[in-house]
Design a protein with these regions (language model features):
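Active-site environment of divalent metal-dependent phosphoester hydrolases
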Residues: 11-15, 33-38, 55-60, 84-89, ...
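Conserved beta-sheet core of the metallophosphoesterase superfamily
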Residues: 49, 88-151, 155
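Short, solvent-exposed aromatic-acidic interface loops
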Residues: 154-167
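N-terminal active-site segment of His-dependent metallophosphoesterases
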Residues: 1-48, 56-66, 71-79, 138-141, ...
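Detector for methionine-enriched segments
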Residues: 1, 79-80, 94, 155
Length: 168
């Protein structure tokens, strides 16, 4: 299965990101969609599993939970918005990682792309950075990878300039 991972769209889902994700089978969104229209636009584009972020309202929280625990082709994925990274996990994230023991932990919030293997919990921590234009980040980013028979492979990063003016 071909997986796309994005976060922190903050009402912005443009052609650069769509082109990067055009061949994926599933989009995972690690929170801060920005509004329900953006969540629906992504869901109309590709099958979507998401979690709500700290900037998402009740309309998004009605459809996207605080955490997602998924099994995709033998890989257990735990996803939440505010998570941190190895050695600096949020307290709730550490509790959930310890309880669920995922192969992949996905989070967003920081707007900083990080892919780090956690030797303590034996899991890959992925933060795809921010796909939107709101925030302090300098570039917009997304990640995609394949999962086949319990193995992750061919991980790629998409990176685009941060736009000041929203495209329609």
């Amino acid at each position: 299965m071909f997986i796309g991972v994005i976060s922190d769209t903050h009402k912005y889902f443009n052609e650069n990101v769509k082109n990067f994700l055009k061949d994926v089978d599933l989009v995972l969104h690690a929170g801060d969609f920005g509004n329900i229209e953006t969540a629906n636009k992504i869901a109309d584009f590709k099958p979507l599993k998401g979690v709500y972020g700290n900037c998402d309202g009740t309309d998004i929280r009605e459809y996207h939970p605080y955490i997602q625990v998924l099994d995709i082709e033998g890989i257990k994925i735990l996803m939440m918005h505010i998570g941190g990274y190895p050695g600096r996990y949020d307290y709730r994230a550490m509790q959930l990682i310890n309880a669920h023991r995922p192969d992949i932990f996905i989070c967003g919030h920081s707007h900083i792309l990080k892919v780090i293997y956690d030797n303590k919990f034996n899991c890959l921590t992925i933060n795809p950075g921010a796909a939107g234009i709101e925030g302090f980040h300098v570039v917009r980013t997304a990640i995609r990878f394949h999962i086949d028979e319990g193995k992750i492979h061919d991980m790629e990063i998409g990176e685009w300039p941060k736009k000041v003016i929203k495209e329609e």
